[in-house]
Amino acid sequence: MGSGYQLLQLPRERFRKTSFLVWVIILFQRAISMPLGIVTNSTLKATEIDQLVCRDKLSSTSQLKSVGLNLEGNGIATDVPSATKRWGFRSGVPPKVVSYEAGEWAENCYNLEIKKSDGSECLPLPPDGVRGFPRCRYVHKVQGTGPCPGDLAFHKNGAFFLYDRLASTVIYRGTTFAEGVIAFLILSEPKKHFWKATPAHEPVNTTDDSTSYYMTLTLSYEMSNFGGEESNTLFKVDNHTYVQLDRPHTPQFLVQLNETLRRNNRLSNSTGRLTWTVDPKIEPDVGEWAFWETKKTFPNNFMEKTCISKFYQPTPTTPQIRARRELSKEKLATTHPPTTPSWFQRIPLQWFQCSLQDGQRKCRPKV
């Protein structure tokens, strides 16, 4: 009997280690990491946000900061033919609009003006107070026609169209937007003793130097059968010169293409439409899919290095399109423009550690 009891009894040292491990598990369950709450079309009500994020986690809703996060950070294709396939028309679904407080710089934004075959508009005008997304590196301005089988254009993946501090579930006519979602950052309240010392006010030199701003470059397109399975996209160089876009490409590729056509006098010199097709051997992913360039450095990035040296035209299909011709066969080496680092290129996502103190749950950023 005694020996049996000895088998069930843990040695003193092992008992200490086991009880310590149990306490660690209990405390770990009490103080868990809390992720960001991502809000999509189906969770727009404040009460739902309170139940999901705020209950027993925050002392006040002032600790919630709504932030617009761009989808392009997830690595989605941003060229116009690929992006437009993510949008579709639906009827009978009321649009929803939600405000957000802060956002990111967008590498790619879009601006659509689409008409039906009878000349009527496919997209509604923006409501009062809805302005275009204010921070875009490239604005892809698309004009064209399509069947538009529905009242409003929605995002097929349930994402938002981000405008200036307003996010909507629908696309508005002629209003620049970025694709994204709304996230809620949970900020810990500062302790009172943080502010006991008198703050030191240092002089700040404000400047209106426009060379320090980011430049927005608008790229124009014409599209037919918008929203259909077989849509056709043309990059517009000028009113009479276009380039057929058959493959995914970077905005930097289109900038180089535009510069090459102009430098080599390949623009249309008549009233007829001249349509170029890019040689299939040319890689359309010059540069990077998402990077920043300042206005100060931008003009020199593509002027001296040209990696696109040959284009050819398709066989004429209408009398207005001029005869097929080919450029020289040589191909220069592809040179990638350098990436300009920026500390505010992305808003960091932060996790928060919560624990019970004096009967209240306190949250602080997790280090």
Swiss-Prot record:
Stored InterPro entries: GPC_FiloV (IPR014625), GPC_filovir-type_extra_dom (IPR002561)
Name of encoding gene: GP
Annotated glycosylation sites: 41, 205, 239, 258, 269
GO biological processes: monoatomic ion transmembrane transport
Record keywords, A-Z: Cleavage on pair of basic residues, Disulfide bond, Glycoprotein, Ion channel, Ion transport, Secreted, Signal, Transport, Viral ion channel
Source organism of this protein record: Reston ebolavirus (strain Philippines-96) (REBOV)
Disulfide bond residue pairs: 109-136, 122-148
Domain of life: Viruses
Family according to the record: Belongs to the filoviruses glycoprotein family.
Signal peptide: 1-33
Name of a matching Pfam family: Filo_glycop
Recorded GO MF terms: channel activity
Keyword field contains Transmembrane: no
Gene Ontology terms: cellular component: extracellular region; host cell membrane
Site (Cleavage): 325-326
Name the record gives this protein: Pre-small/secreted glycoprotein
